[in-house]
Amino acid sequence: MATRASTSSRVSPAFTFLVIFFLLSLTASVEAAGRGVNNDKKGGGLGASFIFGDSLVDAGNNNYLSTLSRANMKPNGIDFKASGGTPTGRFTNGRTIGDIVGEELGSANYAIPFLAPDAKGKALLAGVNYASGGGGIMNATGRIFVNRLGMDVQVDFFNTTRKQFDDLLGKEKAKDYIAKKSIFSITIGANDFLNNYLFPLLSVGTRFTQTPDDFIGDMLEHLRDQLTRLYQLDARKFVIGNVGPIGCIPYQKTINQLDENECVDLANKLANQYNVRLKSLLEELNKKLPGAMFVHANVYDLVMELITNYDKYGFKSATKACCGNGGQYAGIIPCGPTSSLCEERDKYVFWDPYHPSEAANVIIAKQLLYGDVKVISPVNLSKLRDM
C-alpha cells in the first residue's frame, strides 16, 4: 500500500480536551513487575544498557510520577512474559525496542526504571532505564501531562547512577564497565514536535516566534549538550534514534480525518528536517569526542517501511490502533481498561494511538541489531557491543 502525504493540519481543540479528560479519569493501581530476562545467551553479553527517551522506551518510570502519561493499567503489557501479562508501565502490549535489544545482546535483566524502589545495588549492573512518557529534548516539552522526565533530568539521574557505580565497583572498574561494556540508547524527539511545537493551544507562541529551522536548531543544541554531558560521565558507546513518521500514527490520522493511505505532511516534514540535521550532529561528535562511537538509527525509514508494506511483514493493519477508542482508527483515547482491543495483537503495527506493537518492535529491533548501513550506521548494535 502506497502512503501519500496530506497537507491537512486540522487539529480540533475538542479532540485534545477529550484526550486530557479521559486520561484524568483513568485510575491505575497495578505495580510494575517483571525485571528478569532469563537470558541463555553465552559469553560476550552486554554489561549494562542505559536507556534514555520517551514513552517508546519507558519501562515504568512514569508509574512513580503524578502524571497524565501512564501505561500501568490493563491491557497494556498483556503480552509481557516477564511479568506474566501484568502491566509494568510500558506503552505497548509487550517488550519495547530497548527491552528486545538488551535481551538480544545478552543482558542479564531488563534495564530497571531509575525511579523504581529496587533500583539500587547490584540491580543496577544490568542497566538503568531513565525514559519517561511525555519527555523530550526541550524542558517545556510534554507539560500537558503535568509531570514527565525531560532529557536534562534523565542525564542528571544518570549522574546519580554513575556515583553509585563507583561505590559498587570502585572508580577504575566502574569507568571501564561504563565505557567498554555498556551501551547508551537515546530515543527522543517525537514529543518535541507532537507535544510542543505542533501541539494546539500550547504551541501558538512558540510557532509565532520560531521558524521550524530555529526550533530544530534549539533541539539539536540541547541534544548536543546532553550527549556531551553523558560523554563526560564516561559514556562511550551511543545509539541515537531519529524521529519516526509521526504524521502517520493513528492519533494524527484520526484527528486530521485522513484517508487510510494519507499521513500528516507537516509533522513528517518536521521529522525529516530534524533527522537530516541529527545525522550531521552525530557525525560531528564522532570526530570531536575521542574514543566515542555515536551510532545513528534510521527509525523513520524502518517504521515507514512497516506502514507502507505492512502485509509483507504479516500485518493486517498499519493504520488502526489495536487498543484504543475514537474515530476511524481508534486514535483518540489511549489504551486502557475500557478500550476496544483487537483480537490479533501481532497483526497490528500500532498497539495504541501512538506506539508500535511488540510485533513491530521486534522487527525494528532486529534491524538495529543486525541491519546494514541503510538503517544503522556506522555499525549495527551487535558490532557496537563488541567494539
UniProtKB/Swiss-Prot annotation:
Active site per the UniProt annotation: 55, 352, 355
Any GO MF annotation of the entry: hydrolase activity, acting on ester bonds
CDD domains per the UniProt record, alphabetical: SGNH_plant_lipase_like (cd01837)
Enzyme Commission numbers on file: 3.1.1.-
One of the GO biological process terms: lipid catabolic process
Gene Ontology CC, one term: extracellular region
Entry-linked Pfam families: Lipase_GDSL
Residues in the signal sequence: 1-32
Carbohydrate attachment residues: 139, 159, 380
Keyword terms: Glycoprotein, Hydrolase, Lipid degradation, Lipid metabolism, Secreted, Signal
Cellular localization per UniProt: Secreted
SUPFAM superfamilies: SGNH hydrolase
Family: Belongs to the 'GDSL' lipolytic enzyme family.
Name of this chain's protein: GDSL esterase/lipase At2g23540
Species name: Arabidopsis thaliana
Upper classification of the organism: Eukaryota, Viridiplantae, Streptophyta, Embryophyta, Tracheophyta
